[in-house]
């Protein structure tokens, strides 16, 4: 793949086996990698934008987000064939001015007021203090895929807004 590549457009690399992306790549558009990126989780050093469903990861693994990332679309990453207990999520560089992650790999706005991604650990899902808004489709609660599962308790849902 050329080192001068700065953007991958919709379906641009779908079906291509990709082991790494050039560090100067700045933008991954919607569905840009398709199934080609299932086994590599490190994002290019200078990447700025991740579009909707731009990455599909087979089974598990955390996506590394560098300090240069300015925008992550809702549902930018899809973990396929994952189940309760699989490790997934994000590891955001501390120097990133827009996003942060916690020890679980959950994704938040830098100020911690918006939760974009989280997955169920055990039988209860606890929304951390300080979170004011939660992206509803970013909660992986397992019982019936992405929706709130039977018997799953969301602790703190009465004090946040879902969008």
Where are these regions (language model features)?
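Solvent-exposed loop and capping/linker segments of extracellular ligand-binding repeat ectodomains
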Residues: 1-163
